[in-house]
């Protein structure tokens, strides 16, 4: 089976989407895998052929203003205009965000589902991952354990559906981590960044325009 995975994050290899991609690849690595970044992909004839011949097409990307990042959206339109998507191809997606709740990704998943219908392909499933900013801090934690327990369970089910070409209901997950602690750490990180840039605590509350 030929599987194409497209990372839709502008942060490329330094992105949380790349971390999620690598987790997923551990479940599906026995297949032929094509990997691309939507930000830098060049649609030459070889890549066009790979896209068209894919049994599975997986988009992994961050949530941008409740939707799809512009670089990935541009690529989707390109695929659509060039009629690259095979009607037999099954499409899946994983969306992550900086909010605690994974359900915040549901609109972006719906957008990919609608696009799938528009290009006459087959919809598989979507995963909405909350608290994506935690991922880079949990690289030493085994997938499926601790804060990554829910993610491990979701990716295992997701990968089984991929390998069996099965469609299923979308999954939205939160980390196995206290919500209040997540927000506390997020706020502290801003203070640390401010100090690193020689700013004071009060500088974080300055406004460009005063009424």
Could you say what each language-model-derived stretch is?
Residues 23-33, 114-121:
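Short helix-loop-beta junction
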Residues 127-211:
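Glycine-rich phosphate/pyrophosphate-binding loop and the adjoining helix
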Residues 20, 28, 96-99, 120-122, ...:
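Iron-sulfur-associated redox domains of electron-transfer enzymes in respiratory
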Residues 15-16, 103-106, 139:
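Short, solvent-exposed loop/turn segments at secondary-structure boundaries
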Residues 41-120:
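Helix-loop-strand module that forms the ligand-binding subsite of alpha/beta enzymes
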Residues 2-30:
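N-terminal beta1-alpha1 ligand-phosphate binding loop
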Residues 30-45:
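A short beta-strand-loop structural module common to alpha/beta enzyme folds
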């Amino acid at each position: 089976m030929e599987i194409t995975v497209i990372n839709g994050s502008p942060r490329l290899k330094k992105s949380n989407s790349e971390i999620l991609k690598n987790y997923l690849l551990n479940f599906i690595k026995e297949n032929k895998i094509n990997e691309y970044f939507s930000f830098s992909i060049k649609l030459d004839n070889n890549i066009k052929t790979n896209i068209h011949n894919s049994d599975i097409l997986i988009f992994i990307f961050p949530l941008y203003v409740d939707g799809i990042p512009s670089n990935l959206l541009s690529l989707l339109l390109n695929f659509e205009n060039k009629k690259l998507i095979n009607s037999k191809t099954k499409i899946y997606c994983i969306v992550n965000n900086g909010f605690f709740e994974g359900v915040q990704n549901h609109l972006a998943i719906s957008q990919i589902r609608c696009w799938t219908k528009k290009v006459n392909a087959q919809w598989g499933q979507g995963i909405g991952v909350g608290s994506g900013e935690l991922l880079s801090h949990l690289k030493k934690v085994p997938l499926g354990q601790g804060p990554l327990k829910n993610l491990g369970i979701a990716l295992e089910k997701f990968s089984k559906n991929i390998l069996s070409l099965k469609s299923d209901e979308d999954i939205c997950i939160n980390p196995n981590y206290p919500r209040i602690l997540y927000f506390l750490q997020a706020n502290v990180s801003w203070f640390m960044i401010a100090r690193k840039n020689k700013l004071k605590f009060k500088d974080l509350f300055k406004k460009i325009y005063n009424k």
